A protein has these predicted regions:
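Residue-level detection of beta-strand scaffold positions
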Residues: 22, 29, 33, 58, ...
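Short, conserved clusters of charged catalytic residues that mark active-site
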Residues: 10, 17-18, 74-77, 112
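Exposed beta-sheet edge and beta->alpha loop/turn motif
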Residues: 88-121
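A generic structural motif
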Residues: 45, 99-101, 132
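Short, low-complexity N-terminal intrinsically disordered segments enriched in polar/charged residues
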Residues: 1-40
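Short beta-strand edge/turn micro-motifs at domain boundaries
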Residues: 1, 110-134
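A solvent-exposed, acidic/Ser-Thr-rich amphipathic alpha-helical stretch
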Residues: 14, 31-88, 95-97, 107
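Residue-level signal for well-ordered, solvent-exposed loop/turn and beta-edge residues enriched
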Residues: 50, 105, 123-125
Length: 134
């Protein structure tokens, strides 16, 4: 059990770091870094927007940057769960807070997400996203 707990803790820390790096790129509009976190066969399921893929996901950040939006994402403390997917990678589940200024007022929303991460050649990429509870 100790080895499993240690491996699980290590995986948790690894995915938490990947999440942090991904959304630092999102928050700073670092498109080149951001797009490297997604597999080109990405499937993104959204409870309001339906199913989209890699191009829509990348173009969203590109448009956000072009519009000079101040949209920011922050992981909700204590919400992160990470589970191994043997032979593939990991499942990340949590809640995140998005904020931006609209008409001079701070707008915010907390939503739930599930990311499926695949580890290939020591690199983590998200292959599936489920974004819900909007």
């Amino acid at each position: 059990l100790k080895d499993d707990a240690s491996a699980t803790t290590s995986l948790y820390n690894e995915i938490k770091l990947q999440d942090s790096l991904l959304f630092t790129a999102f928050n700073t509009r670092d498109l080149e870094t951001y797009k490297n976190y997604f597999s080109e066969d990405l499937e993104f399921f959204h409870d309001k927007g339906g199913l989209t893929g890699y191009d829509v996901t990348i173009n969203f950040l590109k448009a956000t940057a072009q519009q000079k939006s101040d949209l920011k994402r922050e992981l909700v403390n204590g919400s992160l769960e990470v589970y191994p997917i043997p032979g593939y990678g990991a499942m990340e589940i949590g809640s995140h807070l998005f904020t931006h200024i609209e008409n001079g007022k701070l707008e915010y929303g907390t939503f739930k997400f599930l990311h499926i991460w695949q580890k290939k050649d020591s690199q983590w990429k998200i292959t599936r996203v489920v974004s819900y509870d909007h």
